[in-house]
């Protein structure tokens, strides 16, 4: 099991290769990354049999930017019939697993295999259980089968607590009909990814305040309002009337890059289409000057050297906070609902929750 297999957004295979190669070098795991363009997956081939396991144990998955999912294992050719026997034979040296996910890559060809996986899962699950290879125990490794076709599968393992929260890393979020735009799903997914679900009531509570920079028509504002927050929406464009009717939104016609609240707020969110360095500077200012406690900001990516640019900006932000002597947690992920962008989440670790009065 010396191969690490990773899912990603189609077109970002080289970014996954660059990122995982950097972490492998840091962990002294010898090997090389490879991928074909627009296949929605990449591999890291380790030189030593335990390389993939060491790489996964030494790196938190939720700190990776471009991979959506990862698993260590082997590629397996399958016959047209009796695929289960071949899979069971290959699993002789596998540990007992605590859960089973059947996955496909995020391409048109991959999606065509979804129905096959749905039909194949029940008999496979039954056979694995009867063979003593699958029980219901979240503490044990997760068994992941990624089908490239009906005749080829990647048979792998991952720690359920150190891999994607959803199969293929794709959340099943429902678009709320009352939301002004589909961009609302980006912020909802960001909260799922960056904030543990059991902390939502504390960190996304109705007695909080927020600012949405570049808010119109209100896709991200909607998520803040949905949690009961008082929101100051900053945009020269119009906001959805449905949001204004809630009485929770104050709309200010102003420039999102120059606006500052009179008093600190709990949350700042921003999805302005602008050069990534400029949006990154907003994070430095708002967190560094104590204008907010937490922030979610999207960084639009350049056409080339995308991982290198994101890494450069994150390093710059981190160094800036160190120079100020403040403690900030920094997360960054290309979410499923992101396109040519990544989503950053920052949280001040040394600032108390703000009071409720509306901030203007």
Feature annotation, model-predicted:
Residues 1-360:
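SAM-dependent transferase fold signal centered on methyltransferase-like domains
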């Amino acid at each position: 099991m010396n191969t690490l297999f990773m899912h990603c957004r189609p077109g970002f295979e080289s970014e996954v290769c660059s990122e995982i190669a950097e972490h492998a070098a840091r962990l002294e795991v010898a090997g090389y990354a490879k991928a074909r363009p627009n296949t929605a997956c990449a591999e890291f081939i380790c030189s030593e049999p335990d390389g993939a396991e060491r790489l996964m144990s030494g790196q938190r998955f939720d700190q990776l930017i471009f991979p959506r999912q990862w698993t260590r294992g082997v590629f397996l050719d399958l016959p047209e019939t009796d695929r289960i026997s071949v899979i069971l034979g290959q699993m002789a040296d596998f540990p007992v697993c605590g859960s089973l996910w059947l996955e496909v890559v995020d391409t048109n060809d991959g999606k065509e295999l979804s129905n096959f996986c749905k039909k194949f899962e029940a008999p496979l699950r039954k056979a694995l259980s009867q063979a003593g290879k699958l029980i219901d125990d979240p503490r044990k490794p997760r068994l992941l089968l990624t089908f490239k076709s009906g005749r080829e599968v990647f048979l792998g393992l991952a720690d359920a607590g150190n891999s994607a929260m959803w199969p293929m890393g794709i959340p099943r979020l429902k678009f709320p009909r009352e939301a002004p735009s589909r961009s609302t799903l980006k912020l909802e997914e960001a909260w799922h990814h960056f904030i543990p679900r059991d902390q939502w009531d504390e960190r996304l509570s109705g007695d909080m305040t927020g600012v949405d920079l570049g808010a119109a028509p209100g896709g991200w504002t909607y998520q803040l309002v949905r949690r009961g927050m008082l929101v100051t929406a900053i945009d020269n464009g119009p906001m959805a009337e449905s949001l204004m009717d809630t009485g929770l939104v104050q709309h200010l016609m102003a420039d999102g890059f120059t606006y500052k609240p009179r008093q600190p707020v709990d949350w700042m969110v921003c999805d302005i289409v602008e050069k990534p360095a400029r949006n990154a500077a907003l994070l430095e200012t708002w967190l560094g000057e104590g204008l907010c406690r937490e922030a979610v900001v999207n960084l639009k990516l350049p056409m080339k050297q995308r991982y290198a640019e994101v890494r450069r900006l994150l390093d710059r932000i981190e160094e800036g906070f160190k120079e100020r002597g403040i403690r900030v947690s920094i997360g960054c992920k290309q979410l499923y609902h992101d396109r040519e962008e990544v989503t950053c989440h920052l949280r001040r670790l040394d600032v108390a929750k703000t009071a409720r009065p509306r901030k203007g």
